Amino acid sequence: MGVRIPAEIFPPGEFLKDELEARGWTQVEFADIIGKDTRLVNEVISGKRSVTPETAILFSQAFGTGPEFWMNLESQYQLSKVRPTKDNVVRKAELHGRFPVREMVKRGWIEANKNIDILEQQLFSFFGISSINESPTISHAAKKTSYLEASITQIAWLCRARKVALSAPVEKYSEAKLEIALAELKAELQFVDGARKAGAILAKAGVHFVIVESLPGCKIDGACFWLNKNSPAIALSLRFDRIDNFWHTLFHELDHVKHKEGMTQPIIDVDITGADTADIPDIELRANQVAAELMISPKELESFIARVNPMFTDEQIIGFSRRLAIHPGIVVGQLQKRELIPYSFHRKHLVKIREYVTSTVLTDGFGNMVND
């Protein structure tokens, strides 16, 4: 008899049981026929014992089949038990290739789990998708500072920022409140720890403000999005721990809020101060300009530059900043951006402010984790 390949994978014992029933033989009778203990027959049928070459020959002689049939049944059954593991390896590799799994686990955004189904479900839930081939809805909408499509790592950061923002309590938003908030924020520009008050000021204005540490290679500065049509939210990464960068990025995102941008299409701002202006959309150029002007009056800055350039001494920078009631680091930052001084000059004024911000603003990262 030729070799038969079953359409479904069953243990050889299932076939042995069928053969015995077809012939009306008991396990005791069959054991006597092949000259083996009844225990061997019982264990093969129950799947506790594998079919060996010896038993395959005995079975084939008793049933008139080829020994290859029984060996093929055994080998296919054993392979079927291994295949799910191999499939899991492929699925796991696909998940790690598509999503920043390791970093998400490290940050506590999802839990580490050896069960591929649970890991997969966590990722699908996080990104709001139902299959690995589906793109997160937010990725089709998200606009970056550059025209390049947002990466999955950047989308992961944005998804987390949105989730964290939902936990940030705020008052009802209004444009009038935002204008008041901008004036109050400007009054804090002269203080090293002025950033500490940003969260409370924006909460009164109805703006959800959160900090989410960037993921490796993300290069995100901030984002503007709306939780609903009446709830604007901004998130900063604080990837540059400098007083000038914090205030510039904050005012940049608030300008998006003021213009109701990010309402239907979340805005991801990447390298907002370093990108080539030729690659930046008009709304980003405007937000950058507004942010710079909120910190220093263009007329005042141009007058200062005309008087002092190129001899920007420490005393002159400090005197100018005091007259405008802003921190010297903000002046240094704008002079560097205009390439009027090297980035190595006056760096002592570019003070760190991260600890002040994260002490009062809902923060995910930098040693803090927001519970879901």
Labelled PLM ranges:
Residues 2-372:
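Active-site hotspot residues in diverse enzymes, especially metal/ion-binding acidic/histidine motifs
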